Amino acid sequence: VLSTPMPASAAEQADVRSSDRVLRSGWSNGPLQEVQSWQDLRWQMMQSQPSRDEDAQWVLELQSRDGQAVREVRMAVPATAPEDGVMTPEWWGLRGPWMAPVLGELVPGGVAQQAGLRKGDTVVRIQSRSVPDAVALRASVRASGAEASAAQVWEVARRGKPGLLLIEVQPRRVE
C-alpha cells in the first residue's frame, strides 16, 4: 500500500494516490509481475533494466483503498537518470508504504505539545486540507516549519473522544 507520491514526480503525474495497493508492476512492453509488499516492488524496480523502447513506461496495477476498483497507471520514465543506474521506487516518486497520520512522541515543550496535541492523535486535516498519510503529515509540518507562519487549525481524532477536535497550532521556524 503506497503513501502520497512526491510532487511533480512520475508517480504523481500518473495519478498514484495515497493508500493505493500495488497488485502487479512491470514495463509496458513486457509481462507484469505480482507484488506482495513494498520490498517486493522495490526489488522488482531495482532489478529491472531501463527499457530500450523509448515509448515504454513503468506500469502499476493498483487497487483502491476500498478494495473495489482496480486501475492501471503508466509512469513515464523520468528525465533524469537514476543514481548509479538503479531504478528505485524513489526515482519514480514513490515514497514508501502507507502509514496512518498518527502522532508519535512529541518534543517536550514543543509546538505540538503546547498546542494540546497528544501522542496517538490522528491528524485528519490541517487548514482544511486532508492529511491522507504520515508522509503528507511530515511534508506539511516541514513546510510550516521552514519559515514562521500564521497559526494553523488542525483537525484531529483522539482515542476515547467522539468526533474531531480542532486544535490551533502556531508553527515555529526550525533552524
Predicted feature locations:
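PDZ peptide-recognition modules
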Residues: 1-175
